[in-house]
């Protein structure tokens, strides 16, 4: 959290106008614990203190975040490591900070599903943000047990953990700080598949901007 605040202050310390400048930050998911630094900074007025009006945008499956960055529709976004693939394909992005040294993404199921190992995932329903391949840690963990993406039935997330107990889905791709706790509170018995436990430990939540935005800020 402190790293985020210092980073924002460092980037914008040159702003001396009292008029607030509106900037947008796209988050990779709905509001929850791991975005506390960004949210708290806004609520406490830290952005306003350095003349910024920061608009926090929650995840939207209809928004192409990379396109929005490179076409100046948004100024900043929190991306996953697979965005390096976009950079290798010519997308002009600049990484500003890596917030998590380990990806918080995990797969969660309830014990009543009968799923006890990753080998049981074939033909199972998974609620995820549309492209499971966008997280290299989850993908590597799944592949290591002989499961292919085409073996999975991808569902649009409902953001309702109760769906695991109601048998509307088999697994949820979630942040470790969120759904496992919620499922237990609902009376479930969560089983968590964490890539870190299988030897796949990657950075995550990378604060990013476009090269164009980065150059414009440096020139001011």
Language model regions located:
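Pocket-lining segment of extracytoplasmic ligand-binding domains
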Residues: 81-83, 157-220
């Amino acid at each position: 959290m402190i790293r985020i605040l210092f980073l924002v202050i460092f980037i914008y310390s040159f702003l001396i106008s009292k008029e607030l400048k509106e900037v947008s930050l796209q988050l990779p998911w709905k509001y929850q614990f791991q975005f506390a630094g960004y949210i708290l900074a806004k609520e406490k007025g830290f952005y306003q203190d350095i003349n910024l009006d920061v608009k926090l945008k929650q995840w939207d499956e209809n928004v192409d975040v990379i396109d929005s960055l490179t076409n100046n529709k948004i100024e900043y976004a929190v991306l996953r490591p697979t965005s390096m693939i976009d950079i290798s394909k010519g997308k002009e992005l600049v990484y500003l900070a890596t917030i998590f040294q380990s990806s918080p993404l995990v797969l969660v199921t309830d014990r009543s599903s009968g799923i006890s190992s990753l080998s049981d995932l074939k033909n199972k329903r998974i609620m995820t943000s549309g492209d499971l391949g966008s997280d290299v840690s989850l993908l590597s963990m799944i592949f290591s047990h002989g499961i292919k993406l085409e073996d999975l039935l991808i569902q649009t997330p409902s953001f309702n953990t109760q769906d695991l107990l109601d048998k509307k889905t088999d697994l949820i791709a979630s942040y470790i700080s969120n759904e496992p706790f919620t499922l237990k509170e609902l009376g479930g018995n969560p089983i968590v598949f964490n890539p870190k436990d299988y030897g796949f430990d990657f950075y995550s939540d990378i604060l990013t901007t476009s090269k164009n935005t980065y150059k414009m800020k440096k020139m001011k």
